[in-house]
Amino acid sequence: ETGFSLVCRRAEHMQNAAEARDTAMAAVLKLTPDAVIALCADFAEVYPVNFNCPGQITVSAAAEQMPAFLAAVKAAGGRAIPLKVRGGFHSPFMAEAATSFAADLAAAKLNAPAIPVYANRTAQPYGADVVGMLAGQIDHPVLWEDSVRAMIAAGAATFLELGPGRTLCGLIAKTDASVRTFAAEKAEDFEKLMQEVTPC
């Protein structure tokens, strides 16, 4: 119940922040992280926010700056795909949402994880500051590729994606094709997988 309530509060805060400013997101393909970071630096309010897998980075931007950024990506030899979202997530545009969510988390009195849980903000296991890390993920970049590589380096060889779709399985496969990925959209799918998958 506490977890579900926090998920709802997080969504509310992010929605409020998204409505406060006209922002947008786009996926940048075929460019290196350094190239995308350099392009973003040429704009006052364009930020690299999701480092998904090799050759795929998402940016958040002030809506009025996005057209020029898309043109810059094309000129640099990359490809940019505008995303159908209403908000510049995982960026400074979400700073107020992060602050508000931190208060909710503090009130919930969370404990540190009993097993290693990797934070996408740092690509490292959570430490003692669970509140700061969870809140900070709202307005900081998602280091998904680095997180996957860190888990593989720590010994993970099998990844399970729970929920609709196989997006994360695809990103993991593009990051390291040697690991196994499985997706379970329904409870019965998960139960079947647990019978078939050998633990890492």
Predicted regions and their residues:
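Alpha/beta catalytic cores of group-transfer enzymes, especially the acyltransferase/condensing modules
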Residues: E1-P141, A177
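Acyltransferase/transacylase module recognition
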Residues: A106-C200
